[in-house]
Amino acid sequence: MKGLQVAFKQTLGHVVFDIELQLPSKGVSAIFGRSGAGKTSIINVISGLTQPEQGRIALNSDVLFDSVLGINVPVHQRNIGYVFQDSRLFPHYHVEGNLKYGVKQYDAEMFDKVVTLLALQPLLKRYPASLSGGEKQRVAIGRALLSSPKILLMDEPLASLDMPRKKEVLPFLEKLSESFEIPIVYVTHSLQEILRLADHLTVLDRGQIVASGLLSEVWSSQAMRPWQSFSEQSTLFNANIAEQHPQYALTRVMLSSTASLWVQKIDAPLGSDIRLQVRANDVSITLVQPQKTSIRNIIEAKVERVEKRHPAEDKESIAVKLALTQDCFLWATITPWALADLNLKQGDRVFAQIKGVSVTQRDIALTH
């Protein structure tokens, strides 16, 4: 079977793990959850740093652990790259020495590829003490890649960095899965990192899998509600760039074969694939198509579902799932007053309104 199969049972402290997980053979699979949910424990089991009481771990056709068959491949033979929260560089080696440390067979072409990808050339003769946090993490990622791993495990690699350093490293992480055809398991508690990087998302809580699947599916599911504030509830679209406005700084993106959206200008070629987030509280609903309005996006839709939500004791909101096309949905958040006034019901034909300026660069990521 292709991909990464993780199945194990284990008790660690007060957390009882009962994991059944299938992850794709390439791309970025994010593991998300609150502190103490067991995110790091899962990748430690995959790497072999922790041995479960029972279970099976396999990567494609390679069985790494099987309690029934008595298989437990040692850590150093699993061919796994591991990037920790802290860079763990050797202080007495310069960057080039750190990159080459542990490489079984030096490959000049591979070395140049990694150095170029992570923009490490200016750093090669410098020592870790002179590097910023972001530079250290880029070196740590490079060292892991140069071990020619079959899988890359990343344990919150940006957690120790301040916001400017995170912004420095994120573009390099976005290039990883495009440049290396290996699965990347990425542990994080950051919704923004998930939006920018992940293809697949697993939500974990107290050692149990709450949800696992394609990012766009899990993102809008009930499993994500506890982690999304009122302003963070949103819909994710896999879209592509269809048009650049000749006069204004706006880009039209296709959400489906017929539904499109004008957003703030995206500097990328026509046809580029992107991931797009539309916040639910940026979507309004009208029963009649407006004729003169400043809102650039008026999309005909059908009411698919109406849900009441209680984000706090003193607040109540209504989540409306709108079908733009048969397989393309958009969530809108409205007030109970608006629901009563519009008398919305399943099957009603309505118009969704989204300002062109409401979808900004932070809501858009070029996909692999």
Curated annotation (Swiss-Prot):
GO molecular function (one): ATP hydrolysis activity
Record-annotated Mop domain positions: 292-363
Primary location group: membrane
Enzyme class: translocase
SUPFAM superfamilies: MOP-like (SSF50331), P-loop containing nucleoside triphosphate hydrolases (SSF52540)
Disulfide bond sites: none
PROSITE patterns (UniProt xref): ABC_TRANSPORTER_1, ABC_TRANSPORTER_2, MODC, MOP
InterPro entries with a match to the protein in the record: AAA+_ATPase (IPR003593), ABC_transporter-like_ATP-bd (IPR003439), ABC_transporter-like_CS (IPR017871), Mo/tungstate-bd_C_term_dom (IPR008995), ModC_ABC_ATP-bd (IPR011868), Molybdenum_import_ModC (IPR050334), Mop_domain (IPR004606), P-loop_NTPase (IPR027417)
ABC transporter domain segment(s): 1-231
EC number: 7.3.2.5
Residues the record lists as binding ATP: 33-40
Assigned protein family: Belongs to the ABC transporter superfamily. Molybdate importer (TC 3.A.1.8) family.
Assembly notes: The complex is composed of two ATP-binding proteins (ModC), two transmembrane proteins (ModB) and a solute-binding protein (ModA).
Protein name: Molybdenum import ATP-binding protein ModC
